[in-house]
Structure formats: C-alpha cells, structure tokens
Amino acid sequence: PQAAGLRSRHTRTLGFILPDLENPSYARIAKLLEQGARARGYQLLIASSDDEADSERQLLQLFRARRCDALFVASCLPASDNSYRELQAKGLPVIAIDRVMEPDQFCSVVSDDRQACQQLTSSLLQPLPKQIVLIGARPELNISQERADGFREALQGFTGEVIVEHGESFSRDCGRQLMEQLLQRLGHLPDALVTTSYVLLQGVFDALHDFPLKSRPL
C-alpha cells in the first residue's frame, strides 16, 4: 500500500495539528475528524503543538514529510507567518479548523465566535449586574479577538464595572490562576463572569472550589 501511494502521490493520510490534546473541545473535533476520515478510507495523524509557534512549524514540516494528502490545523501562528502559504503553494491543501486563516488563501471551518459571545454575555444582563468579568487567553489570536469583541458589543450602554483578563494559554491551570488572582484582588465573587473556552472554565471552577466559604455571599 505504501509503494502504491508513492506511485499515485496519494497516501490516504490526513494530518491534524491541534493546540492541546487535553482540551475537551479539540479532543472532540479530533474524534469526529478521525471517524469521518476512517469511514472514507483515510488515516488521520494527530499531533499537538501545545500552542507554541516553533512546535507547530516543526509539526507541519513533519506532516509534509509524511506526504499527507491534506492538513487540518488550529494554528497559533501570526497572520504574517508564511509557513502555510508556502506549504499550500507546494501542493498540500491546508484547512483551518476553529481558528480562521486568510479567507482568500485557505478554507476555514469555524464558529461565529463574535455572535456566540455576544449572545452569551447578553444572557447575563438580566437582572443587570454591577460588575461583569471576561476571562480569556491568547489575546493576539483572531479567535480571542472575535470573542472579546462580542463581549464588548453586548455591553454597549452598560454602566457597571467591566473587567477583562487574558492569560498566556487556553489551559485549566491558566483559568485557575486568572480566577485566583481576580478573587484576591476583588475580595469577593464578581456578579457575572464569561470565559472564552471550556478549559478556562474548568480552571475557574477549581479556583471557586478553593475560595474561602466565608468570602462567599449567602
């Protein structure tokens, strides 16, 4: 089969570079991609970049060396990076998953993050809180900017206190650290809180679990 693949230039393998294998959202995407690929006679190779640019560049070259027929990626590379443009110019199709890439260059399969965060935030405004917090990560990423924009759009005309915190990574530990720091600074729970990912929310719950009971409102 491998020799036949070399002759036909098709290996019936696909690559998927995701930011974090422990992130439940990406784990589910990987599972669905693998199931879909297998049903169509393809093998899906999965690797985690740990949301680090150098690791991601190494992985995309690895998948190119494996002669994958296409590459799916949730990229952390800046828009100015030419790695994927160069890869696609050499004949490897690149499809962006969850994190949008240049629409004139790449196909992207993404959610409407701005609208989703706007709707989520709006749902917390009745009854009107005095204070609302956004906990996110990686503010330089398009996906983070879209979610933060949706948060701010929902708060147009809001006169209460708005706090925005961004960490260095989409991780449970980062969510916990951000929430712990917030609680130490405020000395109380915020009236309303939005997180930009499930994994950050897990960390927030960890921090709330350890928050002293005497500090919690009855």
Residue spans of the language-model regions?
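Venus flytrap/periplasmic-binding-protein-like
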Residues: I95, Q156, Y198, L208-L218
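Short acidic capping loops at alpha-helix termini that bridge into adjacent secondary structure
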Residues: K130-Q131, G160-V162, K214-L218
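Alpha-helical recognition/docking segments in bacterial nutrient-uptake
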Residues: R9-S122, Q126, L182-H188
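Hinge/beta->alpha junction and helix N-cap segments in small-molecule ligand-binding domains
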Residues: L18-R28, I46-S55, L77, R99, ...
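Residues that mark the start of a beta-strand
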Residues: T13, P129-I132, A192
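Short Gly/Thr/Asp-enriched flexible loops that form oxyanion-binding sites at enzyme active sites
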Residues: S83-E86, Q145, F205-D210
